[in-house]
Amino acid sequence: MILPIVAYGNPVLRKVARDIDENYPDLAKLIEDMWETMYASHGVGLAAPQVNKDIRLFVMDSAQIFANMDDEEKSEGNYPDAPGIKQVFINAHVVEEIGDDWAYNEGCLSIPKIREDIYRAEEVTVSYQDENFKHHTKTFDGVTARIILHEYDHIDGKLFIDKLSPLKRKLLRRKLDDISKGNISVDYKMVFPK
């Protein structure tokens, strides 16, 4: 089932999400719905707070980025994480961010039609559980690391716009206000703050 994406301005997006265990009700269905919602919304990642659940869960698929690149894009870039991954992250915690920060143009399903260059570390080591609650600690790099860090921010109550300068945020204020009021048209289901 495709779930509505929570829009900027909803308090759940600013809440630090809580850990869960294997007894969380209907978790398998929620994960399935999150995958369906993410793909229907043309996203590469989706965190539970974006579907109004304050839990430490996100899904991401960096493989689709590489699958959609043409040969010229592939030859021009340095993509150590190709061909990408498709993964569920439960109770994720960043262990370490490694390497120089690099800019990449990011957007967010909860903040539609706003894209900005955001600086993030080249690599990230994350401790997490998969959908079977098996523990992992892995290091990811490139675009995959970036998506993980973006989604991780969501479960920590942060948004990509928080990384912008105060001046840039001020320049975006009207657009952000429009999003929070529902004065925006998107091609996926959204729910706006009351």
Task: Give each language-model segment a name.
Residues M1-L149, H154-K194:
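Active-site rim/adjacent substrate-binding subdomains
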